[in-house]
Curated annotation (Swiss-Prot):
N-acetylserine modification, residue list: 2
Annotated residues for binding of Ca(2+): 437, 439, 486, 491
Cofactor: Ca(2+)
Gene: F13a1
Cell compartment(s), UniProt: Cytoplasm; Secreted
Quaternary assembly: Tetramer of two A chains (F13A1) and two B (F13B) chains.
Keywords: Acetylation, Acyltransferase, Blood coagulation, Calcium, Cytoplasm, Glycoprotein, Hemostasis, Metal-binding, Secreted, Transferase, Zymogen
Organism: Mus musculus
Residues annotated as the enzyme's active site: 315, 374, 397
Binding note for cofactor: Binds 1 Ca(2+) ion per subunit.
SMART domains: TGc
Protein name: Coagulation factor XIII A chain
């Protein structure tokens, strides 16, 4: 086959872009050199009669390549590792006089130098890192080959041909979709850029199709299961379609750096008709609220079938879908949650909270926001484009926050580089550094236009960074992979390095902060249950021999989890007198009627307490977010939990509120157990229970989960889950 196909494109670009896995052109079945003499029948020479790929789930190809979980009847292998095929001929193969080779082709304009046309020669011995095919069996009319792919091979769906040489040219098999072969990244191959040397980590970060995503508040961490479903029917093709939709050149699809960067742009629909439309305004017309999704499968399959972005997602939904994309293609990946995450538009390492002179927060001047939590992903890969030591986990974020090189995407940024302040290395390291390292600065805006720094909290941002633990549903603290402990010499050095490499710090807060006040203030919020009253307790402590009078303000706000306030539902001011070396508590009652009618998606309430000491004019400020405790869905099963056996799943929910829930949707999902399903209830009256039954037939054994969510006009973020142990069907 010629290295460059004929093209009508002229000028500097003689070959059109090859950016679609789905687009294809058939290779010719004959490539003859000159005329074939009369009486010569090319079928008398060696001809292929059948090709066997050993592509069933129980065949060694899929088991050895850890692809037996994919619900896909094509051959799926991982690059850099041998697999087996068998070719049947019309007569016995004689290696002394017969010559043939296997060919793999991807895209519409295949070229050998681009890796889109791969001729695989038959060799005596396979060489590490190179394509080759070795005959391991030659019996009767059948030849079995051990085929080795390159560990740098393009990742995608290849078309396969077998070419046989005759004295008059090449004979080639016809295009046969049954021989199509998917080639994926290979974390089990030491020469692959995504190689991960720990089997338990590979089991978790590549093969686990159910995860746990953490959300809530630093003081009230909550978790929810998420069905990644990377092995479900149609998901692999959808992930390839996502790259096609991005018009990503096929030659770059073997590079995990490029694939993850394209994925971070394409999972959101901000500027490229990607997978998910983001919405943070609590209005979800013509779509599904973010909290209703139970996993990635419904989202990706809807995107593929409609070829339009799916509505709606927020950070944990973007992260869940992106995790599916990465794991499906073979890139080790995990979802990360950063508590108190700075959304720093200009990456100046500073979140400014402006106060008026009386101590109230100035909503007019305060533009920065601190997200209660933010989810992104980490992908494991080498970084040959960076200095040694910056490979490993890379932060990648598909939530559309800021523009990077003209598109809404973020990463991959080396986590190790972020920790040490080396923000000069691509991609988007300054933004990630700011998310976990910014200072929270309280500034009084004087009437004369001057600003006075009242306090700096250097420990609030990036308070805790977590992910799911390996082999369990618990939480693993990975904060120390992103930052050194506050006060360590290494932490100061990392900040200085970041500033040297271009990170900005608007205000020099060193030495500007006022001296420590004689009075300290703290406040606590008791466990708040949705629909119930609760108390906020503020404590003042006078550590001096002076008498002080205090004017304090409490502001309660309904907030998005992004820290943006929607509605102030509680405002109270009070005065307290503090005797020397004394403490005093103030209790404020918050009634359910004050907040219920204003609630948003996740039930976040944010309290801000400021106090001014009249005698010293010192300002004290504290803030705290809470998430209301929300009722759960109950899931029960009856029947044998066995592959191929019917099992009845019952979903049950009781409305604990005093109001009727309208337009209720319940979503149910369980990878390997049942396909995602939805059920609508027109209403659920107060203290009324609804039930929904579905019959399913599991097809995957081992530990499985059923995951349910409920959403309505006035109540969302309701979840439930059930762990299952699905037994194998006994062999007869």
């Amino acid at each position: 086959m010629s290295d460059t196909p004929a093209s009508t494109f002229g000028g500097r670009r003689a070959v059109p872009p090859n950016n679609s896995n789905a687009a294809e052109v058939d290779l010719p079945t004959e490539e003859l050199q000159g005329l074939v003499p009369r009486g010569v029948n090319l079928k008398d020479y060696l001809n292929v009669t059948a090709v066997h790929l050993f592509k069933e789930r129980w065949d060694s190809n899929k088991i050895d390549h850890h692809t037996d979980k994919y619900d896909n009847n094509k051959l799926i292998v991982r690059r850099g590792q041998t697999f087996y095929i068998q070719i049947d001929f019309n007569r016995p193969y004689d290696p002394r006089k017969d010559l043939f080779r296997v060919e793999y082709v991807i895209g519409r304009y295949p070229q050998e130098n681009k890796g889109t046309y791969i001729p695989v020669p038959v060799v005596k011995e396979l060489q590490s890192g190179k394509w080759g095919a070795k005959v391991i069996m030659n019996e009767d009319r059948s030849v079995r080959l051990s085929v080795q792919s390159s560990p740098e091979c393009i990742v995608g769906k290849f078309r396969m041909y077998v070419a046989v040489w005759t004295p008059y040219g090449i004979l080639r098999t016809r295009r046969d979709p049954e021989t199509d072969t998917y080639i994926l990244f290979n974390p089990w191959c030491e020469e692959d850029a995504v190689y991960l040397d720990d089997e338990k980590e590979r089991e978790e970060y590549v093969l686990n199709d159910i995860g746990v995503i953490f959300y809530g508040d630093f003081k009230d961490i909550k978790s929810r299961s998420w069905s990644y479903g990377q092995f479900e029917d149609g998901i692999l093709d959808t992930c390839l379609y996502v790259m096609d939709k991005a018009e990503m050149d096929l030659s770059g699809r073997g590079n995990p750096i490029k694939v993850s960067r394209v994925g971070s742009a394409m999972v959101n629909a901000k500027d490229d008709e990607g997978v998910l439309v983001g919405s943070w305004d609590n209005v979800y017309a013509y779509g599904i609220p973010p909290s209703a999704w139970t996993g990635s499968v419904d989202i990706l399959l809807e995107y593929r079938s409609s070829e339009t972005p799916v509505r709606y997602g927020q950070c944990w939904v973007f992260a869940g879908v992106f995790n599916t994309f990465l794991r499906c293609l073979g890139i080790p990946a995990r979802v990360i949650t950063n508590y108190f995450s700075a959304h720093d538009n200009d990456a100046n390492l500073q979140m400014d909270i402006f106060l008026e002179e009386d101590g109230n927060v100035s909503s007019k001047l305060t533009k920065d926001s601190v997200w209660n939590y933010h989810c992104w992903n980490e992908a494991w890969m080498t970084r040959p484009d960076l200095p040694v030591g910056f490979g490993g986990w890379q932060a990648v974020d598909s939530t559309p926050q800021e523009n990077s090189d003209g598109m809404y995407r973020c990463g991959p940024a080396s986590v190790q580089a972020v920790k040490h302040g080396h923000v000069c290395f691509q991609f988007d390291a300054p933004f990630v550094f700011a998310e976990v390292n910014s200072d929270l600065v309280y500034i009084t805006a004087k009437q004369d236009g001057t600003h006075v720094v009242e306090a700096v909290d250097a420990t609030h941002i990036g308070k805790l960074i977590v992910t799911k633990q390996i082999g369990g549903d618990g939480m693993q603290d990975i904060t120390d992979t992103y930052k050194f402990q506050e006060g360590q010499e290494e932490e100061r050095l990392a900040l200085e390095t970041a500033l040297m490499y271009g990170a900005k710090k608007t205000l020099n807060t060193e030495g500007v902060v006022k001296s420590r006040s004689d009075v300290t203030m703290n406040f606590d919020v008791e466990n708040a249950v949705l629909g119930k009253d609760f108390k906020v307790t503020i404590t003042f402590q006078n550590n001096s021999s002076n008498l002080y009078t205090i004017l304090a303000y409490l502001s309660g706000n309904i907030t998005f989890y992004t820290g943006v306030s929607k509605k102030e539902f509680k405002k109270e001011s009070f005065e307290e007198t503090l005797d020397p070396f004394s403490s005093k508590k103030k209790e404020v009652l918050v009634r359910a009627g004050e907040y219920m009618s204003h609630l948003l998606e996740q039930g976040f309430l944010h309290f801000f307490v400021t106090a001014r000491i009249n005698e010293s004019r010192d300002v004290l400020a504290k803030q705290k977010s809470i998430i209301l405790t929300i009722p759960k869905i109950t899931i029960k099963v009856r029947g044998a939990a066995m592959v191929g056996s019917d099992m009845v799943v019952t979903v049950e929910f009781t409305n604990p509120l005093k109001e009727t829930l309208q337009n209720v949707w319940i979503h149910l999902d369980g990878p390997g157990v049942m396909r995602p399903k939805r059920k609508v209830f027109r209403e659920i009256r107060p203290n009324t229970t609804v039930q929904w039954e579905e019959v399913c037939r599991p097809w995957v054994s081992g530990h499985r989960k059923l995951i349910a969510s409920m959403t309505s006009d006035s109540l969302r973020h309701v979840y439930g889950e059930l762990d299952l142990q699905i037994q194998r069907r006994p062999t007869m």
